[in-house]
């Protein structure tokens, strides 16, 4: 090769392995408004300095590989590389550190949660230099937020569609989740809706099984909600689960739901995948369907304190990918959820602007600009005695979903729905009158049960039921 045609890469190239921190640990770096910022909980292997571990995360999730390569000279690594710009120890934990990494926006495809996660968490979690790694939070810059459609409709549009204001919405997951015929399933839906619930729900694993094919379920559920609407004068919905084995089949189910005129469909966004979810969210906006999101499989990813991805990151990703509701934990029921941490990501779902607040696990200030909000869904092991706490914790912009807490009523589904609706209305009225739900909640429920035999029966059945376990997800 003559000197005239010699490439930059062949000048000064030296093969071999060098420490990541020499290139990717840059404590002097000042982050840009356009950077995606990540907070990783890093547990290095014994003998690995935290700076090297943090730099390795930055390298392996951006431009780096295990050895020096001559093609590095063909591009500007300083422009494209991730940078570990700050490391701090985790209080009370041995050999755990929070490593802050900044990624240039050019590393990511516009409007693609799939590509964002493939880059940031795709390969680095199996890295040998780390004993464990957890992505605690992401700061999504407004320049990147604006490339996403986000939720199909958002909180205000949903309330306008349903004509329901000033209170949380009420739902119920139909049980048993598997085994019912389509007609019996539709009957259970009708009983719940006519009793006063706003929504009923397919469970996450109800797709199209031999005992109940999806088309039969959609037809009987549509009949049930139209009948309940006619009797109550309220708009009703059933989350018809469109999740399927292929994107084409998923879209076929969503199209059929739209043809039936129902207001809402459902998707399991983690098992279904972000590409499928974003496609469905776009269809729902274009065709006036609300989209309920179930987070099946989330605990596989987020339950371990030192490894995986925290749910606040999955919640942010869902808001970008698209969904009008998402399950968020209850704080008081049978499923995981510590109060301050749960409310931290509930605010990340609902609000336009969220300040950094480490006491709630929020590592970065997040500005969602014009992206619509998502309603958090409290579901799992809750019943009428929990209603005051749920109303106080989650406020009006939420969905409170009682499965067993409706269908387990001794008199049947409709009385179970009546009990929940009466309890909710009593709590909202008491709150509006200035009463303290936290201290007077049980008294409020007892007062309401005096004029509602359905609520009185529910109070008697569930008076001793508690789920008292220490939360795993702590700061």
Curated annotation (Swiss-Prot):
Residue numbers bearing the N6-carboxylysine modification: 201
CC cofactor: Mg(2+)
Keyword flag Plastid: yes
Enzyme's top EC category: lyase
Active-site residues from the entry: 175 (proton acceptor), 294 (proton acceptor)
SUPFAM superfamilies listed in its UniProt record: RuBisCo, C-terminal domain, RuBisCO, large subunit, small (N-terminal) domain
Pfam families: RuBisCO_large, RuBisCO_large_N
N-acetylproline PTM positions: 3
Enzyme Commission (EC) number: 4.1.1.39
Subcellular locations according to the entry: Plastid, Chloroplast
Post-translational note: The disulfide bond which can form in the large chain dimeric partners within the hexadecamer appears to be associated with oxidative stress and protein turnover.
Site (Transition state stabilizer): 334
Cofactor note text: Binds 1 Mg(2+) ion per subunit.
Role this protein plays: RuBisCO catalyzes two reactions: the carboxylation of D-ribulose 1,5-bisphosphate, the primary event in carbon dioxide fixation, as well as the oxidative fragmentation of the pentose substrate in the photorespiration process. Both reactions occur simultaneously and in competition at the same active site.
Family note: Belongs to the RuBisCO large chain family. Type I subfamily.
Protein known as: Ribulose bisphosphate carboxylase large chain
Organism: Magnolia macrophylla
Organism lineage string: Eukaryota, Viridiplantae, Streptophyta, Embryophyta, Tracheophyta
């Amino acid at each position: 090769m003559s000197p005239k045609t010699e490439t930059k890469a062949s000048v000064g190239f030296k093969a071999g392995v060098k420490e990541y921190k020499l290139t990717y640990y840059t404590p002097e770096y000042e982050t840009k408004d356009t950077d995606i910022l990540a907070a990783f909980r890093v547990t290095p292997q014994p003998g690995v300095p935290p700076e090297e571990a943090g730099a390795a995360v930055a390298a392996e999730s951006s431009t780096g590989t295990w050895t020096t390569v001559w093609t590095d000279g063909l591009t500007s690594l300083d422009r494209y590389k991730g940078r570990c710009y700050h490391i701090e120890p985790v209080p009370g934990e041995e050999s755990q550190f929070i490593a802050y990494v900044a990624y240039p926006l050019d590393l990511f495809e516009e409007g693609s949660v799939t590509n964002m996660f493939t880059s940031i968490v795709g390969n680095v979690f199996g890295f040998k230099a780390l004993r464990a790694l957890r992505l605690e939070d992401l700061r999504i810059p407004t320049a990147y937020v604006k490339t996403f459609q986000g939720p199909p409709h958002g909180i205000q549009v949903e309330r306008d569609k349903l004509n329901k204001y000033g209170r949380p919405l009420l739902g119920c997951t139909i049980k048993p989740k598997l085994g019912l015929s389509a007609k019996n399933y539709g009957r259970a839906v009708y009983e719940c809706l006519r009793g006063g619930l706003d929504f009923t729900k397919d469970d996450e694993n109800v797709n199209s099984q031999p005992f109940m094919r999806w088309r039969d379920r959609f037809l009987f559920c549509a009949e049930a909600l139209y009948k309940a609407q006619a009797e109550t004068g309220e708009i009703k919905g059933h989350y018809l689960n469109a999740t399927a084995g292929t994107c084409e089949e998923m879209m076929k189910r969503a199209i059929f739901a739209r043809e039936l005129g129902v207001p809402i469909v459902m998707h399991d966004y983690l098992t279904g995948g972000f590409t499928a979810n974003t496609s469905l969210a776009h269809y729902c906006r274009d065709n006036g369907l609300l989209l309920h999101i179930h987070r099946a499989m989330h605990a596989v990813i987020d339950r371990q304190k030192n490894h995986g991805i925290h749910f606040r990151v999955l919640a942010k990703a869902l808001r970008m990918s698209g969904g009008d509701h998402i399950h968020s934990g209850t704080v008081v029921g049978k499923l995981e959820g510590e109060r301050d941490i749960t409310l931290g990501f509930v605010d990340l779902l609902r609000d336009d602007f969220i300040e950094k607040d480490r006491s709630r696990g929020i590592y970065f200030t997040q500005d969602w600009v014009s992206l619509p909000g998502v309603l958090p869904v409290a579901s799992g092991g809750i019943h009428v005695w929990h209603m005051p706490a749920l109303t106080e914790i989650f406020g009006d912009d939420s969905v409170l979903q009682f499965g067993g807490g409706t269908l387990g009523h001794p008199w049947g589904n409709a009385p179970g729905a009546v009990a929940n609706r009466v309890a909710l209305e009593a709590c909202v009225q008491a709150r509006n009158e200035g009463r303290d739900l936290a201290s007077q909640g049980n008294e409020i429920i007892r007062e309401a049960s005096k004029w509602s035999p359905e609520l009185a029966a529910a109070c008697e059945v569930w008076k001793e039921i508690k789920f008292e376990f220490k939360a795993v997800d702590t700061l």
